[in-house]
Amino acid sequence: MKEIGIETEYITLGQLLKMTDTISSGGMAKWFLSEHEVSVNGEAEDRRGRKLRPEDTVNIPGTGEFRIVVAEGMSFDAH
């Protein structure tokens, strides 16, 4: 499982798809999520605006499994 460090309270699922090079533009997120079974914390998710916070895990078919973490040097209350 790969870790994705974030410097904000959360990122959206659409942002994660771009960060992992799963899609080349944000406009592709809705299409990708309608065609592929992405899961967040083990549950199917098709909303590109889904907020991902530290400790969330995301499985993207063909790309891999990711865990959201607080970026090194950052500190904030994750929940």
Regions found by a protein language model. Name each.
Residues 1-3, 35, 57:
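Low-complexity, intrinsically disordered short peptide segments enriched in small/polar/basic residues
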Residues 12-54:
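A basic, amphipathic helix-loop patch mediating RNA/tRNA/ribosome contacts
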Residues 49-79:
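C-terminal structural segments of small proteins and small subunits
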Residues 1-11:
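A detector for short, charged/polar N-terminal pre-domain segments
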